């Protein structure tokens, strides 16, 4: 059988973090608001929450017009100690799924080449 019990130390840590959840989400929303305002009048699209939802902004994302601009921004930010990264690879591109049935996912493939994940941690200050 499986042992799904959580060790006491992990449970204590989880309870302590849950007591701060409102602060964490409020701070992430403030950071996202700053990003949104900063990129508002540019050719770089900040991926915002949809009108019918409320995001926790766990991960903030920029969408560029093309892969070259994204790659230039990735290089520039990382050279200047701003840690950014491309998104995770699409599952269809992972070796372990190479033999699986695949659909046409041109939109996902296009976005994968133009997305940049930007700093999203709670300790960020506006």
Positions of predicted regions on the chain:
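PLP-dependent aminotransferase class I/II
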Residues: 1-126
């Amino acid at each position: 059988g499986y042992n799904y019990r959580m060790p006491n130390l992990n449970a204590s840590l989880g309870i302590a973090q849950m007591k701060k959840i409102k602060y964490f989400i409020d701070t992430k929303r403030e950071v996202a608001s700053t990003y949104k305002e900063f990129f508002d009048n540019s050719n770089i699209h900040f991926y915002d929450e949809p009108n019918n939802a409320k995001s926790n902004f766990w991960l903030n994302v920029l969408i560029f017009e093309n892969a070259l601009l994204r790659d230039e921004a990735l290089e520039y930010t990382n050279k200047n100690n701003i840690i950014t990264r491309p998104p995770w690879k699409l599952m269809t591109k992972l070796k372990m799924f190479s033999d699986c049935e695949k659909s046409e996912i041109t939109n996902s493939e296009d976005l994968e080449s133009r997305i940049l994940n930007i700093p999203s941690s709670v300790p960020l200050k506006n």
